Structures are given as C-alpha cells and as structure tokens.
Amino acid sequence: MIGYLKGQILSLSEDSVLILVNGVGYEVNCAPVAVSALEEGQETALYIAESISPYDGTVLYGFLTKEDKQLWAIFKTSIPNTGAKKALEYLNKALRSVADFHNAIVKKDPKILTGIFGFTAKTAEKLIHSLDGKMDAVTIAGVPKIKIEGEAPFMSEVMMALTALGYSPMEARKAIDQLYKTGLANDSVENIIRAALRILKK
C-alpha cells in the first residue's frame, strides 16, 4: 500500500497531480485548493491514501499534510453515504479555514458552514450531526478567524457576503477588524459591506 510519494510534478489539473517518482508517474487526486499551491516541475511530497473504485480500480488520493489526510479519512468514515471522492469535496471546502470549520462543528453553527464554506443547509446539518465528537481527534493548525466573542451578531452576515464575493475568511476577517478600529462597524450591514470592500480593494 502506498502511503507517501515524493517526486517531481509533471502536470496539474484542477483536481489531480501527475507526480514522477523513480521513473514512474502516479496520477493522484487532490483537493483543488491543494493543487493551487503546487507548480509543474517542482519537487513535492504527498501523503497518500488508496481507495478501490468499482470502475477505476485503485485510486490514489493525495494530501499536503498528515492532518489533511486525517480530516479526509474522518469525513469518509463518519459521514453517511460519503465515499473517497465526496470526502475530498468536503475537505476542499474545509481547507478554506480548518480552524473555523472545526469551530463551526463544535459549536453546531450551520450558518458558518453554509455562509462561509458553501455547504447546503441539509449538508451542514448532516456534518454537524455526523462529526459530533469526531473532530477532537483532528490536529488543528491556526485559530478561528470568523467570529470574535462580543462581536455584533450581524457580522456573520458581513463575513458571508464577503466570502461569497470570493474573498477568503482571513481577508474578510482583517477588513472587519479594521472597521472595528475606525468605529465603522456600528453602521448598517450594507454600509459595513461597502466599507469592507473599499478596504479589500486597496
């Protein structure tokens, strides 16, 4: 069983990598967010998990860290009707901010899962139910960026709006933090979003 590959990247697609190891090219499925961090020609290392598909035989899934592989495995084994490919889709969304995803599951907050990570309401509820108590086993790097204790409740709406426009949770968080410093965070939701966009476009 293959557990780790280290070699040169021959080619990239949106969700896969062709990596050359000792003269052999391995096609590895990866989360698109992980693929975006790689470049053709560079040397890289991937943690590997194998999955058996009735149509494709043995399929390789690759991860940049052991923690990503661990989270994918939890999705695959804990969430009903979730195979290797679907687990990778969930992982790709969670990798936007693993600390915030963990926080949303622990606090049972479907709004963060739908607004920030793009899950449907039905899937968000399924994730919260299925992963209850399971996320404790995951090693979390970083700290949550989405919400601060004592923050105005409508700030989650601002976060959702900014991430829906393509900004990362970290970028949105920094813009909101700046608004708090200037006192503009007490305005209406619409005006706060406009002010945050002005900051982000500088």
Swiss-Prot record:
Keywords: Cytoplasm, DNA damage, DNA recombination, DNA repair, DNA-binding. Residues 155-202 are annotated as: Domain III. InterPro entries: DNA_helicase_Holl-junc_RuvA_I, NA-bd_OB-fold, RuvA, RuvA_2-like, RuvA_C, RuvA_C_sf. Residues 1-64 are annotated as: Domain I. One of its GO terms (molecular function) is ATP binding. GO terms for cellular component: cytoplasm; Holliday junction helicase complex; Holliday junction resolvase complex. Residues 65-146 are annotated as: Domain II. CDD domains: UBA_RuvA_C (cd14332). Residues 147-155 are annotated as: Flexible linker. GO terms for biological process: DNA recombination; DNA repair. Transmembrane segments: none annotated. It is found in: Cytoplasm. Its main location: cytoplasm. Pfam families: HHH_5, RuvA_C, RuvA_N. Homotetramer. Forms an RuvA(8)-RuvB(12)-Holliday junction (HJ) complex. HJ DNA is sandwiched between 2 RuvA tetramers; dsDNA enters through RuvA and exits via RuvB. An RuvB hexamer assembles on each DNA strand where it exits the tetramer. Each RuvB hexamer is contacted by two RuvA subunits (via domain III) on 2 adjacent RuvB subunits; this complex drives branch migration. In the full resolvosome a probable DNA-RuvA(4)-RuvB(12)-RuvC(2) complex forms which resolves the HJ. The RuvA-RuvB-RuvC complex processes Holliday junction (HJ) DNA during genetic recombination and DNA repair, while the RuvA-RuvB complex plays an important role in the rescue of blocked DNA replication forks via replication fork reversal (RFR). RuvA specifically binds to HJ cruciform DNA, conferring on it an open structure. The RuvB hexamer acts as an ATP-dependent pump, pulling dsDNA into and through the RuvAB complex. HJ branch migration allows RuvC to scan DNA until it finds its consensus sequence, where it cleaves and resolves the cruciform DNA. Belongs to the RuvA family. Has three domains with a flexible linker between the domains II and III and assumes an 'L' shape. Domain III is highly mobile and contacts RuvB. This is Holliday junction branch migration complex subunit RuvA. It comes from Elusimicrobium minutum (strain Pei191).
